[in-house]
Amino acid sequence: MKFGVVVFPGSNCDRDMQDALQYDLGQEVIMLWHKDTDLSGFATEDCIVLPGGFSYGDYLRCGAIARFSPIMQSVIKFAGEGGKVLGVCNGFQILCESHLLPGALLRNANQQFISKNVYLRGEGDQGRALMIPVAHGEGRFYADEKTLDELEAGGQVIYRYADEQGIVGAAGNPNGSLRNIAGICNKTRNVFGMMPHPERACSEALGNIDGRAILKALFIDKKQPSVRKEAGLVNI
């Protein structure tokens, strides 16, 4: 499996994502610049990643300008053909702005930037809660009741905020997200978005590798051999 990590002006988690995928999980990574439009080197079993940061300075609205960047038209087409797409934090906001995922990410309920470890419960997961960092000012997931019910009915809620014991409730919700939603997918289950940063919890050196479980569960075929290739920015 091959990963393409998109770099927008203002991205600041692109290299974190590269390191997690390439060095911690042994996957092939290609860095993509926001002006790139050719994704013909990626097959539908590959994945394009929209990382965290402040794309285009988050002017107007988080992800609102990045949604119109040259590469996003290709990403939308890639997703429509069944290719895998992951958006983390600002990447999740971009996916919602692009209408690849429903809903919106609003200002945190406490009106403050939040940077801390939180706990996540995967839907249907009976294991322990995963500790994953968040770092956002606009991470409160919102959608109308009809959309929320459709997400629930379709099994599209993939992660919810929880407490350390894995109990989903107000105590574990850092930003006021409706129904404690931390991550969702589309109906065809090839586009995924989440506010927490799994790439920041993949290295033993950081004392937390819970993020590996998330990335592996979403994408990586455990039967395939690991590969390591150097990744560099292209077409800057």
Which ranges hold each PLM region?
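Active-site metal-binding loops of divalent metal-dependent hydrolases
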Residues: G53-F54, G91, G137, P198
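Active-site-proximal beta-strand elements of phosphoester/diester hydrolases
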Residues: F3, M131-A135, F192-M195
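Pocket-forming structural segment of enzyme catalytic cores
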Residues: E97-L178
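N-terminal beta1-alpha1 cap of cysteine-dependent amidohydrolase-like domains
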Residues: M1-G87, S98-P102, N108-F113, E150-E152, ...
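Beta-strand-turn-beta hairpins that frame and shape the catalytic cleft
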Residues: M1, G124-A129, N186-V191
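Conserved beta-strand scaffold positions in the cores of enzyme catalytic domains, especially
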Residues: V29-M31, V85, I132, G183, ...
